């Protein structure tokens, strides 16, 4: 086994015993990144920074070293990294190098992590297939015939890099499923924490009331380790919760006897593939065999989640993206003679934003306009409150976690849905958006392969602030499923 194929937990042990140096581990990842160019996962590699950090980690080894000392990670391009290009995969931020570090990356570096570089994503995190990126498509390491498949989105580069062993783990962000859907498409683990568990400071904003950062890893244990380093109160983020961070790894007891797992009947969608239904049934059996009690529950407002999400998220995006005007940073359009400031705004935004971002800004501006605010935005906010209430009632009735499919299908081909009706693409988030609207933690765990040999995942949804319990349920599901398949290397 090459060092880059290790999990965080195994690498941590090997580093502690002196069987491996952080420099060797980092070099193995940098070699894999060079070989993995066809995946287009890393868009800004930072080998010099990585090796400097690895040497420092080796010097620190032993007492007092952080939980991630010497562990090489990939960072989604949405996180501001000081002095390193941070473009949110958009032409409008071309050449932008922040003068400050995001709270998440600061915490990772304090824990001793090594940054291998920045990862591909959908532009401004708007997309479900990593096809809206200014860097071009990220490619799923899993393949069927000669079709290039999507790794999912928006954290597609993160998912592809972890699944292909280019890094030990990666950061992602999740606004409507952008950690969990790509994790399911690539056979890895991805957790979206409770809204407010991880600081959003220094993460380029898409929809501020929905965005949440989280880890994308090779195992549930790794997710627990990485989340422990990322989480915590941050006075610089007013939505960050001042709640103690438990030892998530210590919570992985593997004992869920007597725990109640809810199965929401509304997630049985019309036209759902039989494979997804069968996988869901298998997941129920695995948790029941581990001693959990399986109960049917109702989340009656589920069917309104996607329409509400695609009003609220674009509305917040149109407000957040108003700051990109070519005045202070990023791209500025070349102006003609006689052009004024308004011409500069219009030309800069037309050149800098891709089609999907433009579409969502237009939708958002429309639903926030005076004539339509009550009909769309206010109504969507009311629906959001009802969706949250559905979950609150289920948890109040004693449910500890909720089991659902993660995605309505396995990974689809690049280009196959991009030209279709955008609504068809938006349906990829059908099982995940409710979790963001309610601010809950959710995790995707790989459980099996479909008939084509592509990975499928199940989602577990937890009580607010109970990532520890959620990770333990996911740990049980992961062990029972025994998913060890890896993509066959073609790159």
From Swiss-Prot:
Keywords: ATP-binding, Ligase, Nucleotide-binding, Protein biosynthesis. Belongs to the amidase family. GatA subfamily. The keyword Chaperone does not apply. It holds the Pfam family Amidase. Signal peptide: none annotated. One of its GO terms (cellular component) is glutamyl-tRNA(Gln) amidotransferase complex. Heterotrimer of A, B and C subunits. The active site is at residues 76, 154, 178. Its EC number is 6.3.5.7. It comes from Cereibacter sphaeroides (strain ATCC 17023 / DSM 158 / JCM 6121 / CCUG 31486 / LMG 2827 / NBRC 12203 / NCIMB 8253 / ATH 2.4.1.). NCBIfam families: gatA. GO terms for biological process: translation. It comes from the Bacteria. Allows the formation of correctly charged Gln-tRNA(Gln) through the transamidation of misacylated Glu-tRNA(Gln) in organisms which lack glutaminyl-tRNA synthetase. The reaction takes place in the presence of glutamine and ATP through an activated gamma-phospho-Glu-tRNA(Gln). One of its GO terms (molecular function) is glutaminyl-tRNA synthase (glutamine-hydrolyzing) activity. SUPFAM superfamilies: Amidase signature (AS) enzymes. This is Glutamyl-tRNA(Gln) amidotransferase subunit A. Gene3D superfamilies: Amidase signature (AS) domain (3.90.1300.10). It catalyses: L-glutamyl-tRNA(Gln) + L-glutamine + ATP + H2O = L-glutaminyl-tRNA(Gln) + L-glutamate + ADP + phosphate + H(+).
């Amino acid at each position: 086994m090459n060092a880059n194929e290790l999990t965080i937990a195994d690498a941590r042990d090997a580093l502690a015993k002196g069987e491996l140096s952080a420099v060797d581990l980092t070099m193995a990842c940098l070699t894999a990144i060079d070989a993995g160019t066809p995946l287009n996962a890393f868009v800004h590699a930072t080998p010099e920074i990585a090796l400097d950090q690895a040497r420092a980690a080796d010097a620190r080894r032993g007492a007092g070293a952080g939980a991630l000392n010497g562990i090489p990670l990939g960072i989604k391009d949405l996180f501001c990294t000081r002095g390193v290009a941070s473009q949110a995969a958009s032409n409008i931020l071309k050449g932008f190098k922040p003068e400050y570090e995001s709270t998440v990356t600061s915490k990772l570096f304090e824990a001793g992590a090594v940054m291998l570089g920045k990862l591909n994503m959908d532009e401004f995190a708007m997309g479900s297939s990593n096809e809206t990126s200014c860097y071009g498509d990220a490619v799923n390491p899993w393949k069927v015939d000669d079709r290039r498949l999507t790794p999912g989105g928006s954290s597609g580069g993160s998912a592809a890099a972890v699944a292909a062993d280019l890094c030990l783990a990666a950061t992602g962000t999740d606004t409507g499923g952008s950690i969990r859907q790509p994790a399911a498409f690539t056979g890895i683990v991805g957790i979206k924490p409770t809204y407010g568990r991880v600081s959003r400071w220094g993460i380029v904003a898409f929809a501020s009331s929905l965005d949440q950062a989280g880890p994308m890893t090779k195992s549930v244990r790794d997710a627990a380790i990485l989340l422990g380093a990322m989480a915590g109160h941050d006075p610089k983020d007013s939505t960050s919760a001042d709640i103690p961070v438990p030892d998530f790894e210590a919570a992985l007891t593997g004992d869920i006897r007597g725990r109640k797992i809810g199965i929401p009947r509304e997630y049985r969608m019309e036209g759902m593939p039989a494979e997804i239904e069968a996988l869901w049934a298998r997941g129920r059996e695995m948790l029941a065999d581990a001693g959990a009690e399986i109960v049917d529950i109702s989340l009656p407002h589920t069917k309104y989640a996607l329409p509400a999400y695609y009003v609220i998220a674009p509305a917040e995006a149109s407000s957040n993206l108003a700051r990109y005007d070519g005045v202070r940073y990023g791209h500025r359009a070349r102006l003609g003679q006689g052009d004024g400031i308004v011409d500069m705004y219009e030309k800069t935004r037309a050149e800098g934003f891709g089609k999907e971002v433009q579409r969502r800004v237009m939708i958002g501006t429309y639903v926030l306009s005076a004539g339509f605010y009550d009909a769309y935005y206010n109504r969507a906010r009311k629906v959001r409150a009802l969706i949250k209430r559905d979950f609150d009632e289920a948890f109040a009735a004693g449910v500890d976690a909720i089991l659902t499919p993660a995605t309505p299908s396995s990974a689809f081909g690049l280009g196959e849905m991009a030209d279709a009706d955008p609504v068809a693409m938006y349906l990829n988030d059908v099982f995940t958006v409710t979790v963001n609207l309610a601010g809950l933690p959710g995790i995707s765990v790989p459980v099996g392969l479909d008939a084509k040999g592509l990975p499928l995942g199940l989602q577990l949804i937890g009580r607010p602030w109970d990532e520890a319990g959620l990770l333990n349920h996911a740990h049980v599901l992961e062990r029972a499923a025994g998913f060890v398949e890896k993509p066959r290397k073609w790159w």
